[in-house]
């Protein structure tokens, strides 16, 4: 037996370690490999390049509102395929697929709760649900959010992330633009603040209605915001668009939005703005999240 064969005979094969799926992810911008749990703790913001990745509607609302204060509104509303619409796939099949993938019934989630102890109503889009498209249920839930804000005499916050109106619902989806805008007029009559937070992307019928009707329109960094997409505009005007066209930084230079706020700073910034608008005390950034039980410092044993 040669020395190589003797070495091979003493080698014990080991089982290849398997890494569960979803433990790691890659930044869409810089390509950095990131630990999924750490990225979630960082609110889906890349710690290397500060790229703001898309966030689920529920995670966004849970990161905004005080813990233990959240109550969901309009969860009983479900979309119906009234037109029996079909393109390459039946609309009802698209709905079933999106509901299974996201766990949501439709693209908008609405909750009421408190923000640093201040009552608010908040809505957030689930972009993974058919591109966050606006149909009749999205419009109905948004109106429900407005009605709840009027009933509670409190502010309304909406986080938009949408490709626009849902083509499978045709005119019924376009009608939601007028419906939601009319509902917001009641907020204005009452003198209650409505803050619109524009995230990547906010396009089409959503940007042409309630997303741009905020008393304050805030955007996340580098969010794509507009009506038609940049490629469509380039093909229409037959000109090369400026670098960064329709991004938050471009829009704030043109006065189309009021400010850009990083996601980790969004919660305190919204609370500070609303406190001023509602003539309430400024929030204490050091205060613990409402509903979180902070353990007391244990008594020290007296020294002998």
Curated annotation (Swiss-Prot):
Residues 23-292 form the CoA carboxyltransferase N-terminal domain. It is an enzyme of class 2 (transferase). Residues 295-304 have a biased composition (Pro residues). One of its GO terms (molecular function) is carboxyl- or carbamoyltransferase activity. Its EC number is 2.1.3.15. Zn(2+) binds at residues 27, 30, 46, 49. One of its GO terms (biological process) is malonyl-CoA biosynthetic process. Its cofactor is Zn(2+). It comes from the Bacteria. It is found in: Cytoplasm. The keyword DNA-binding does not apply. Binds 1 zinc ion per subunit. One of its GO terms (cellular component) is acetate CoA-transferase complex. It catalyses: N(6)-carboxybiotinyl-L-lysyl-[protein] + acetyl-CoA = N(6)-biotinyl-L-lysyl-[protein] + malonyl-CoA. The keyword Zinc applies. Acetyl-CoA carboxylase is a heterohexamer composed of biotin carboxyl carrier protein (AccB), biotin carboxylase (AccC) and two subunits each of ACCase subunit alpha (AccA) and ACCase subunit beta (AccD). Belongs to the AccD/PCCB family. This is Acetyl-coenzyme A carboxylase carboxyl transferase subunit beta.
């Amino acid at each position: 037996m040669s020395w190589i064969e003797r070495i091979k005979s003493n080698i014990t094969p080991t089982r290849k370690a398997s890494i569960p799926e979803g433990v790691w992810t890659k930044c869409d911008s810089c390509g950095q490999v990131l630990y999924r749990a750490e990225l979630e703790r960082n609110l889906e913001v890349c710690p290397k390049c500060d790229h703001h990745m898309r966030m689920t509607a529920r995670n966004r609302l849970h990161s905004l509102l005080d813990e233990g204060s959240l109550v969901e509104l309009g969860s009983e509303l479900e979309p119906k395929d009234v037109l029996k619409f079909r393109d390459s796939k039946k609309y009802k099949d698209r709905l079933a697929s999106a509901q299974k993938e996201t766990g949501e019934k439709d693209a908008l989630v609405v909750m009421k709760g408190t923000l640093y102890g201040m009552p608010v109503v908040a809505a957030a889009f689930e972009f993974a649900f058919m591109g966050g498209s606006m149909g009749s249920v999205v419009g109905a839930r948004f109106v429900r959010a407005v009605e709840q804000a009027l009933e509670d005499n409190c502010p309304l916050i909406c986080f938009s992330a949408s490709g626009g109106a849902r083509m499978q619902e045709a005119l019924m989806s376009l009608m939601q633009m007028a419906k939601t805008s009319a509902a917001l007029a009641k907020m204005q009559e009452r003198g209650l603040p409505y803050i619109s937070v524009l995230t990547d992307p906010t396009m089409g019928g959503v940007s042409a209605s309630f997303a741009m009707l905020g008393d304050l329109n805030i955007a996340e960094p580098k969010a794509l915001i507009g009506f038609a997409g940049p490629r469509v505009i380039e093909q229409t005007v037959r000109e090369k668009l400026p670098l960064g066209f329709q991004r938050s930084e471009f829009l704030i230079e043109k006065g189309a939005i009021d400010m850009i706020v990083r996601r980790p700073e969004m919660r305190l910034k919204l609370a500070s703005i609303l406190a001023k608008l509602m003539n309430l005390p400024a929030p204490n950034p050091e205060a613990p999240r409402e509903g979180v039980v902070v353990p007391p410092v244990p008594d020290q044993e007296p020294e002998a």
